[in-house]
Amino acid sequence: MNPVPMPASNALSKPLLPEVEAANAWHDAELAAALVAVLRHKAGGIRVCAQPGPVRDYWLALLDSFTETPARRVPSNTPTERLLGGMDITESMRYGKPVLAQGVLAECHQRVVALSMAERLPKEFTGHWCAALDTGEVHIARDGISHTSPASITVIALDEGIDEESPPAGLIERLGLSIALDEISIRCVDDSRYARSDILSAQSRLSHTTVPDDDLTRLAELAASMGIHSSRTLKFTVDIAKALSLLSGKPVSDE
């Protein structure tokens, strides 16, 4: 049974992959959704390169079915005062002291956030998203208010960019996963290989799953040989390998 309704067609701007390749690409995208659901903020999130259409909608609905909480859509042009929060004028006047109006990032604590048109995220707002991904918090210090709120978020960066358009590099490097959907036909989208119970089972065992020291060393050496020296990237790789192991039933070293 399909986890979500399947649309009838898909409008794509890129040539479609051959059927077998497209089916494999969809299975990879499906696995990526399961990994995001298992890891949440541990993976930062995922970059989804795709134009609006039924395949992207189906993938987002699939992720919602894995998390059982719909992703909250946040436009990329959401300003600082709405992202971080600020003084609630009405309540401040009522109580005669500064009262905080919670921002979007704090409202989305422990939730999945779909950042619409991430390729157009203004530079002046990028730092707020990156800080929340780095620390799991947002800090506000203005209008007589100094407050830190939890903001552990999982970001789905919806990248609709064409040609040279791309989300800010600082955001991309904080997302552990990336998929592209535009070359997948809706006809190649099939039933999910994973269920909500698989996600919950993997989550419950994740903290008890370890990567052997030898494998960690090999991963670090491989990353260095490829010119990758980011500890964040290495951590993403380790966490993703553990989640893959739990979803596939294979040893971590195989992943």
List each model region and its residues.
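Alpha-helix N-cap/helix-start motif at coil-to-helix transitions, marked by capping-box chemistry
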Residues: 77, 209-213, 235
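Short, well-structured alpha-helical interface segments that form or flank functional binding sites
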Residues: 124, 170, 214, 232, ...
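An alpha-helix initiation/capping motif
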Residues: 53, 57, 217, 235-239
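C-terminal helical "lid" subdomain and adjoining coupling/linker elements of P-loop NTPases
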Residues: 222-255
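Phosphate-sensing "switch" segment of ASCE/P-loop ATPases
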Residues: 146-226
